[in-house]
């Protein structure tokens, strides 16, 4: 069945993948890329999903720029029902990389008084059982590319050792994104990529601009964030300068414009 998305999808593919930096070894022909895009869009219609297939295509475009001989896995933090995981597994199969999935498979963690988004009512939201996630990937993705590491980020992420080509964070809470950055950023390869679906939570975006956080944790300047939070006014808020919740520098937040 043809509709408006079917007409515009080829334009999206052209816009994202008309790129001389895509490595020729991937044999990323127009038809292969178009087939990939349709599959990702279909998966988004079949599985309950928290992020857009367009974002997944943008990740594919960046992975295709990394030479295939460059070491590095893809990491996803927060997979919900496995919709984004299925799409990432398809992309990983396209580029020949493995996908490591971190999730509690119990939904969101306990409330955090330092985080206005982490209220008691949020506990358990976005829960996807591990077996349900695996079943969705087996049906719509490439399960052979996936490994699953179950548990809270504070327990599992410190054990991560693999080089990372691309990481995708969809974690909702400030403590969670803090755990992801502290434990995964040191493993990101040179010219690797970090994507986040939490760009609508400007409190979470702010950490990418926090001079104090990046100097303390990594002895470097903050990388910033392309997209939401890049200094363009968004509603009532803009990112930076920073203040802290409860005097805790781990949780910088934006200042009202």
Residue ranges and their predicted role:
Residues 55-56, 129:
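Activation loop
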């Amino acid at each position: 069945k043809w509709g408006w998305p079917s007409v515009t999808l080829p334009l999206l593919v052209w816009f994202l993948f008309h790129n001389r930096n895509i490595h020729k070894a991937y044999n990323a022909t127009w038809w292969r890329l178009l087939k990939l895009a349709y599959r990702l869009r279909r998966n988004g219609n079949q599985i309950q999903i928290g992020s857009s297939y367009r974002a997944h295509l943008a990740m594919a475009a960046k992975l295709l720029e990394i030479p295939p001989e460059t070491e590095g896995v893809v990491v996803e933090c927060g997979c919900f029902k496995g919709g984004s995981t299925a799409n990432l597994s398809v992309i990983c199969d396209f580029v020949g990389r493995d996908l490591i999935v971190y999730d509690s498979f119990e939904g969101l963690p306990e409330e955090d008084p330092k985080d206005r988004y982490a209220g008691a009512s949020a506990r358990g939201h976005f829960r996807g059982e591990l077996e349900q996630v695996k079943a969705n990937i087996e049906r719509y993705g490439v399960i052979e590319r996936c490994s699953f590491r179950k548990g809270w980020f504070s327990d599992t992420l410190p054990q991560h050792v693999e080089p990372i080509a691309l990481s995708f964070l969809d974690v909702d809470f400030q403590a969670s994104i803090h755990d992801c950055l502290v434990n995964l950023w040191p493993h990101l390869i040179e010219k690797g990529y970090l994507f986040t679906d939490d760009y609508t939570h400007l409190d979470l975006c702010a950490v990418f601009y926090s001079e104090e956080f990046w100097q303390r944790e990594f002895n470097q300047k903050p990388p910033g964030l392309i997209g939401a939070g890049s200094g363009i006014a968004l509603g009532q808020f803009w990112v930076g300068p920073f203040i802290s919740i409860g005097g805790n520098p781990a949780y910088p937040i934006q200042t009202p414009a």
